[in-house]
Amino acid sequence: MYKAYLLIFNSMKQKKQFIFLLLGLSLCFSHSVYGESGTNDEKTKTISFRGIYADDPSGREGLYNPERGLRLEIAVDIANKKDVWNPKQFPDITGHLESESAIYASDSISLVQSYFYLTGFAGKSLSEEAFSTMDTYFNKLRELDKKAVLRFAYETAFMGRAETGPTLDDVLRHMEQLKPFLAQNADVIQVVQAGFIGAWGEWHSSYHGLEKSDASKRTILEKILWMTPENRMVQVRVPEYKNLIDKNSQQYNRTSFHDDFIIIKPHKWDGGMHEGSPHFNQIVRESPYLIIDGELPWGTWSMNEDPDNPEAGWIVDGKATARQLFLQHYTSLSAIHNYKEKGTSDKYSMIYWKETPVDEAFLQENRMPVSAGYFQNRDGSPAQRNVFDYIRDHLGYRLELQQLQISGKPAAGKEISLDLSLINRGFSTLFNEHPVYFVLIDEQGKVTEFLTDTNVHDFQPYDPKDSECTPLIHTIKGKFTVPQDLAAGTYKVGLWIPDGSERLKYNSRYAIRCANGDMEWWNSSDNNYGVNILATLEISPR
């Protein structure tokens, strides 16, 4: 599946419009905005939409959407069924996850970096109880309407402090066991990170020196790619690891990046990933088609409150970070690091970001995405925005509908045409499975679905080869014939983009909400549907 949509990326990435045919729907439309009348009682109607103004309802809050944005971080000791770092406070499987979800609820979190520590299984196979523990965690993620940025690890100490660790045979044996388990839970996995080796699964400081051989690193990475469902990507810590595998292979194209040390300025621990380095440039070049994740160092570390950092403390620059996240098409960023950590004598970086204004001139100078009304109130007066909110709002995708055009005769058995245009104002396109439907909603809330051929992976913010980063306009286009047996009456027509899995499809929290301040977001009473309402339709009898 991934190979198929990768081919679509490569063949269509320079197009500025994407046209998708829809089969089998028939509707008749009525709206307050009418265009030019056609012949034979046909009309063309045009409805324009706008982005979100600062003083729109919830206009300064994050727009909750699946598989994008700020993320949490949770580490579970699978053998002992408790939190790795706070076992006394969270002596169970999901307590920390529930606590952090509540603390960060205002930050519109839909992703959780989920560490499964297999420390207790070095030298032996994973038990049935281990899989039951992981199942419990995944089920809680579903209950909380979140997905996992998944990483497996064994060792919790670095710089030669690890007391034990897995052998290569341990790692490979566990991956054999994990493959079917991950396939069963692919719905709740956004991406898999290439862990397993060394401290925190970051491919350094391993007890048995697994990272010291290119051969062992290549073997482990290729096995992780084999273990991971084919329709999911695998992220590595630095491009150096990705470059160990064949550049012409499908595995290479499925391999993405996570930068666990975003500090902007060069540093000996940055993995050679600062701006201007070959690694930085490789990520810029490949990231339009990859899921990119990252995190700042811990606030205690960057503020020189950690014994492992003897340097002077500093604040990670917010505007420079926003620019890097844009250049490298970031989908997600940790909200756990350098934000709400406790016990500091000063504020951490992300709190300073909330106090750092960002303006349209800076974004235009750096060709960064922004909606026309992002820096305005509804009355046209200027509105100030800060760099934290800008990053929160633009990580991943941000679909802003532009215009709906409807033409045709509003009668049963007659054909109408529908064109819906949009711009992706986010840093990246969409990934994984998100089918696109038009839906009809009657006055009783009954929903009728019409699947389109739209491929959301094509929704690039701009052509990656365009140095001006001009926003692309994408079009969903369809022709429909009004069904003969559709009851006459008033309907809402909407855009529904659910999760692609059968398990999560009918969960409104996994449906994609467009970034439009003048559009109703409709939830069905059973929470099966989350729909962007486009127009009111008056369907007439023949």
PLM regions: where:
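An active-site-proximal structural segment forming one wall of the substrate-binding cleft
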Residues: 130-142, 165-191, 216-227
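Active-site groove signature of glycoside hydrolases
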Residues: 149-158, 178-211
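Catalytic cores of secreted or luminal carbohydrate-active enzymes
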Residues: 326-403
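Boundary/entry segment of secreted carbohydrate-active catalytic domains
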Residues: 38-105
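Catalytic-core regions of glycoside hydrolase
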Residues: 191-198, 202, 206-360
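Aromatic-lined substrate-binding rim segments of carbohydrate-active enzymes
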Residues: 97-154
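Extracellular/luminal regions of secreted and cell-surface proteins that mediate adhesion/ECM remodeling
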Residues: 385-542
